[in-house]
């Protein structure tokens, strides 16, 4: 299990038998290397442009093409879960970039006219289907640490809201304006 710093361990306050409580505050985990750009430009869909550029160059070097896709901004209602995603971002970047990047958690407070655009991420079904997915394993550990049984979800039959409530998976299918984002960690 990941060593989530104490200041982000909010599952004890959010997690119930029904899953993670949802309110108007969202979190996004990423690398500290991206914070200065996010502070100026917000969180852009398709994520890490530098990492995408490196992937495109690598594919060109080996004679293959790379088609960049536009992905939404992935969110969660838990700082603890966002930290897990931030660790993944740092690990992904460490393969291609040198430096001392750290996981950071960003808080997102959307204006009223944008709040209803946050949707449950049913694309997470792939993680549920794959035995041994590390995020699902970490999530199981969080449930266990809080004395709650991990939900037995059938990804084909699960209600959309289960992906949000039980797995903490949501998305926002547009860029998040900079004025809506604050840094929770450094």
Pin down the residues of each PLM region.
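A structural signal for short, well-ordered beta-strand segments and their strand-loop junctions
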Residues: 26-28, 74-76, 107
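Short, well-structured hydrophobic secondary-structure segments
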Residues: 64-84
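Active-site and NAD+-binding cores of ADP-ribose-processing enzymes
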Residues: 2-5, 29-31, 50, 92-186
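Alpha-helical interaction segments
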Residues: 16-18, 75, 161-162
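Short helix/loop capping segments that flank catalytic or ligand/cofactor-binding pockets
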Residues: 36-37, 83-85, 117-118
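ADP-ribose/NAD+-binding catalytic cleft of ART/PARP-like enzymes
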Residues: 1-70
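Short active-site loop/helix that positions an aromatic residue
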Residues: 79-95
């Amino acid at each position: 299990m990941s060593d989530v710093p104490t200041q982000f361990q909010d599952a004890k306050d959010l997690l119930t038998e029904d899953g993670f409580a949802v309110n108007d505050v969202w979190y996004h985990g990423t690398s500290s290397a991206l914070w200065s750009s996010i502070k100026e430009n917000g969180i852009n869909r398709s994520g890490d442009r530098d990492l995408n550029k490196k992937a495109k160059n690598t594919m060109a070097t080996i004679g293959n093409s790379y088609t960049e896709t536009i992905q939404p901004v992935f969110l969660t209602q838990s700082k603890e879960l966002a930290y897990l995603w931030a660790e993944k971002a740092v690990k992904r970047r460490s393969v291609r970039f040198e430096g001392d990047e750290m996981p950071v958690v960003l808080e997102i407070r959307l204006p009223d006219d944008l709040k209803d655009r946050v949707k449950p991420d049913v694309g997470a079904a792939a993680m549920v289907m794959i035995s041994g997915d590390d995020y699902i394993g970490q999530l199981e550990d969080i449930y266990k640490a809080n004395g709650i049984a991990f939900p037995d979800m059938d990804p084909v039959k699960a209600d959309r809201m289960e992906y949000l409530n039980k797995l903490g998976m949501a998305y926002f299918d547009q860029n998040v304006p900079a004025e809506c984002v604050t840094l929770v960690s450094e």
